[in-house]
């Protein structure tokens, strides 16, 4: 399956990495690469994440970091919807 990142999901990931980079550019790069690698696993295991809070979605919990990546499995692709820190309030809309 193909992974498609929505623009707002990429923006979320970049914003989070930029925030981490203020303290440690090396940690920011490690975080960014870890999220990308985690999401790549969905190509082979699209239902790896838990059932999502929003109907029709799933949530990939990022190991070693307090982040969740909500996504949607389509017929031939996986849509990455957002990247959220676990401590933040969940938005009404993805």
PLM features per residue range, with description:
Residues 2-57, 74-77, 93:
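Basic, Lys/Arg-enriched alpha-helical interface segments
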Residues 7, 62-64:
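Conserved strand-loop elements at the edges of beta-sheets that form or border functional pockets
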Residues 41-42, 63, 83:
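Conserved catalytic core of Hanks-type protein kinase domains
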Residues 68, 72-94:
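Enriched for short, Lys/Arg-rich terminal
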Residues 57, 66-68:
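Short hydrophobic/aromatic beta-strand or adjacent loop that forms the aromatic wall/cage
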